[in-house]
Each structure stands twice: as structure tokens, then as C-alpha cells.
């Protein structure tokens, strides 16, 4: 599994209320959620983001209310992976459950800047900053996590398991 895109970088303690404000929680429409992703801290995010781009955060990314809407909004906006110094645990689980790749690495999150082009090889745990060819090593996802992400989420993965049983 691989991803490549441009960096959209944010700071520490980006909470779920900022990722998708509560005023939009009355919809389950993924495109509608994507249209409002990050609007309270980056009003141009939706216009800037392209399919495959990478979001980078600081410490405690995804803190706050436990809402699956937050990783759904990020994924539906076109983001292929989030790299952060650390994640709120419930956000981490919700992201994996909906098939959004996330990588926890202080070194990588610190080194990448807005606009850097990044290539990620999830199978090998290699992240490359294409701007300066700097490479970083991370721990690859365990096989079952890769399967969940490849299946586009936990529910799809379960359906595949049932179909193959």
C-alpha cells in the first residue's frame, strides 16, 4: 500500500470540534462533511486539498469529542494519511475503523512542512519527503490493520471475512 501527496500541516491539540464543527453533525453524508472539514482553522482547506494529500499534525491530534465524523470528513476530503506527533486514542481507533491510514511519528511530523510532497510506502514503513529526498523509517502497520485500511474500513473488512468463511 502506498500514498503520495502534498502536506497540509497543523499544530498541537487539533480537536474533533475543529476538524468537523458540531453544527454539521446532523449529516452522515461524507461529501457534505468533507465540504466543512477544517473550516474553522483553515477556511481554504477544501479548496487546497487534492486526492491523496497528507495531513500532518502535532501532539494530541484528534482530541476532544469521540466522533467518527472527524476522520470521515478528513478521508472524504481526499486526505490519504495523517501523520502526527501523537493521536488521541479514540481518534486513532476511529480512523483505522473507517480505513484512514494514520502514522504516529514525532520526527516525521516535526520535519515536514506545508506544501512538501511526501511519498509513503506503508508496507515497508518508509516515508520520503520528495522535496529533499529525506527518508524516515516508521513501524509498518500490522497485517490485520493493513487489511482493514485496504478494505476501506472495519465494517467492509468484516463483510469480506464473512464472505470468505
From Swiss-Prot:
Q: Which domain of life is it from?
A: Bacteria
| InterPro entries per UniProt | Aconitase/3IPM_dehydase_swvl, AconitaseA/IPMdHydase_ssu_swvl, IPMI_Swivel, LeuD, LeuD/DmdB_bac, LeuD_type2/HacB/DmdB
Q: What is its EC number?
A: 4.2.1.33
Hey, which pathway is this one from? Answer: Amino-acid biosynthesis; L-leucine biosynthesis; L-leucine from 3-methyl-2-oxobutanoate: step 2/4
Transmembrane portions of the chain:
none
Lyase listed as a keyword: yes
SUPFAM superfamilies referenced in this protein's UniProt entry, alphabetically: LeuD/IlvD-like (SSF52016)
The GO biological-process annotations, alphabetized, read as: L-leucine biosynthetic process
From the UniProt record, list the reaction(s) this protein catalyses.
Answer: (2R,3S)-3-isopropylmalate = (2S)-2-isopropylmalate
Asked if the Swiss-Prot or TrEMBL record annotates the protein with the keyword Lyase, the reply is yes
Q: Which CDD domains match?
A: IPMI_Swivel
Q: Which GO terms describe its molecular function?
A: 3-isopropylmalate dehydratase activity
Q: Which UniProt keywords apply?
A: Amino-acid biosynthesis, Branched-chain amino acid biosynthesis, Leucine biosynthesis, Lyase
Enzyme class (EC, first level): lyase
Q: Name one Pfam family in it.
A: Aconitase_C
Function recorded in the entry? Catalyzes the isomerization between 2-isopropylmalate and 3-isopropylmalate, via the formation of 2-isopropylmaleate.
The Swiss-Prot or TrEMBL record describes its family as follows: Belongs to the LeuD family. LeuD type 2 subfamily.
| Subunit-structure text | Heterodimer of LeuC and LeuD.
Q: What's the protein name? A: 3-isopropylmalate dehydratase small subunit
Amino acid at each position: 500500500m502506498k500514498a503520495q501527496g502534498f502536506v497540509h500541516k497543523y499544530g498541537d491539540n487539533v480537536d474533533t470540534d475543529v476538524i468537523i464543527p458540531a453544527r454539521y453533525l446532523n449529516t452522515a453524508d461524507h461529501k457534505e462533511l468533507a465540504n466543512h472539514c477544517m473550516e474553522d482553522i483553515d477556511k481554504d482547506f477544501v479548496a487546497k486539498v487534492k486526492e491523496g494529500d497528507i495531513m500532518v499534525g502535532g501532539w494530541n491530534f484528534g482530541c476532544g469529542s469521540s466522533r467518527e465524523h472527524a476522520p470521515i470528513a478528513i478521508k472524504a476530503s481526499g486526505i490519504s494519511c495523517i501523520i502526527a506527533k501523537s493521536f488521541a486514542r479514540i481518534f486513532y481507533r476511529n480512523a483505522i475503523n473507517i480505513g484512514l491510514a494514520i502514522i504516529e511519528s514525532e520526527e516525521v511530523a516535526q520535519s515536514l512542512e506545508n506544501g512538501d510532497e511526501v511519498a509513503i510506502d506503508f508496507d515497508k514503513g518508509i516515508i520520503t519527503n520528495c522535496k529533499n529526498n529525506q527518508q524516515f523509517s516508521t513501524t509498518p502497520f500490522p497485517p490485520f490493520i493493513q487489511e482493514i485500511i485496504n478494505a476501506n474500513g472495519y465494517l467492509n473488512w468484516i463483510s469480506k471475512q464473512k464472505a470468505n468463511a
